[in-house]
């Protein structure tokens, strides 16, 4: 399914020689990002409905299953089928019997909005999850970050067309981009990338995201054992607390030649 459509719209603007707006009924062609409800169905039982871009949904299903703790490893999933239905898309996931039994014990239904929200959470004390503390297995040369930022920007093909999507990319320790995923929801883009990361053998490196660093972005990164998250915008206080607790290197406001290091500075050098 295509991730963008063309549509004729009305627009307004000021001309160079006047402070007045031109007529509101001028028309132009615009490109809109496609946003569609995607139902994640485990062994025939609907678990979650998320608003997504309709691409790379197998990777999304794998990443979501990992970051939500439904599975521990890709091998816990026996098969994934993407099926278009009349009002959206169903991603049909076949879990191992053991994982499906565990899921049924605390199955919940939810409707997400552009990938936001703590998925399937009913009580406040379920929000704050604890994971094993991340080991420090590498150091990253901050001088390489500028080229990574350039690569992130120029490879956001859907974002360049529509201006309506987020991107998450994975870079190795030499600053080479290994994968990039875009979606209308930043959490969904991250789940897609983490699905790729898991099925690719968990290469060492870091995630660069076009969004802010929210608590859930940090939680998903930590859950999949990635040691470093860099974002274009700021981090929230809870995201920083989560990063510090789990020894995640977290950088925000990443720009050419600068950035805020919120936690995990021992992985960085210049």
Swiss-Prot record:
GO terms for molecular function: sulfur carrier activity; sulfurtransferase activity. GO terms for cellular component: cytoplasm. Signal peptide: none annotated. It holds the Pfam family FdhD-NarQ. One of its GO terms (biological process) is Mo-molybdopterin cofactor biosynthetic process. SUPFAM superfamilies: Cytidine deaminase-like. It comes from the Bacteria. The active site is at 116 (cysteine persulfide intermediate). The keyword Oxidoreductase does not apply. Mo-bis(molybdopterin guanine dinucleotide) binds at residues 253-258. Keywords: Cytoplasm, Molybdenum cofactor biosynthesis. It is found in: Cytoplasm. The keyword Cytoplasm applies. NCBIfam families: fdhD_narQ. Required for formate dehydrogenase (FDH) activity. Acts as a sulfur carrier protein that transfers sulfur from IscS to the molybdenum cofactor prior to its insertion into FDH. HAMAP family: FdhD. Belongs to the FdhD family. This is Sulfur carrier protein FdhD.
């Amino acid at each position: 399914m295509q991730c963008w459509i063309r549509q004729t719209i009305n627009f307004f603007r000021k001309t160079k020689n006047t402070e007045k707006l031109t007529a509101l009924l001028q028309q132009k062609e615009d490109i809109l990002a496609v946003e569609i409800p995607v139902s994640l169905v485990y062994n025939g039982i609907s678990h979650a409905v998320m608003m997504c871009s309709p691409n790379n949904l197998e990777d999304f299903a794998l990443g979501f299953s990992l970051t939500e703790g439904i599975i521990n490893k890709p091998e816990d999933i026996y098969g994934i089928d993407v099926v278009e239905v009349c009002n959206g898309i169903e991603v049909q996931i076949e879990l191992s019997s053991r994982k499906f039994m565990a899921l049924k014990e605390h199955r919940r239904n939810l409707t997400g909005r552009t990938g936001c929200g703590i998925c399937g959470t009913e009580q406040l004390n379920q929000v704050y999850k604890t994971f094993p503390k991340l080991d420090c297995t590498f150091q990253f040369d901050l001088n390489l970050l500028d080229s990574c930022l350039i690569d992130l920007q120029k490879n956001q093909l859907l974002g360049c067309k529509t201006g309506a999507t987020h991107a998450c990319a994975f870079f190795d320790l030499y600053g080479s981009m290994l994968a990039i995923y875009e979606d209308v929801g930043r959490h969904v883009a991250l789940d897609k990338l983490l699905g790729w990361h898991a099925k690719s053998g968990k290469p060492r490196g870091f995630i660069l995201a076009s969004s802010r660093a929210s608590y859930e972005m940090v939680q998903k990164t930590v859950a999949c054992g990635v040691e470093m998250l860099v974002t274009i915008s700021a981090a929230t206080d809870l995201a920083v607390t989560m990063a510090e607790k789990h020894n995640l290197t977290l950088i925000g406001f990443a720009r050419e030649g600068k950035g805020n290091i919120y936690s995990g500075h021992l992985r960085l050098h210049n």
